[in-house]
Regions:
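Conserved, structured core segments of small domains
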Residues: 1-114
Length: 114
């Protein structure tokens, strides 16, 4: 587990603007719509990364990270990836998980839903 946590942490350091990573392959996810699970909301810093990774291992095997300029913190989330054609399902999932936005990886844009 420590090796996986360290690997994701290192990946976040070389991707300071954000990333979406399949933690089984350690390869970036470049297509689809990323939606965070509520259970890992407000996870920031390396100390929260273990919890995020544990959740991801039990669910979608994908972790997202992004830097919030308002709080000056790097956040991590366990995320679920939907096909772009499943945008309605992704939005419903996001609402059920109290998310303010989803991220379109294919077009590199945030989609606000609230």
């Amino acid at each position: 587990m420590k090796q996986l946590t360290d690997g994701v942490w290192e990946y976040s350091l070389i991707n300071p603007n954000g990333f979406t990573l399949n933690i089984e392959t350690m390869k970036p996810v470049k297509y689809g719509i990323s939606v965070a699970y509520e259970e890992t909301q407000d996870s920031f810093g390396k100390e929260s990364l273990n919890r995020v990774i544990n959740h991801a291992l039990e669910h979608s095997k994908t972790v997202g990270g992004w830097f919030d300029t308002d709080s000056n913190r790097y956040y991590f989330d366990s995320v679920k990836i939907f096909k772009n054609s499943e945008i309605d399902i992704a939005i419903e999932f996001a609402k059920n998980h109290n998310q303010l936005a989803i991220y379109d990886l294919t077009n590199l844009e945030e989609i606000r839903i609230k």
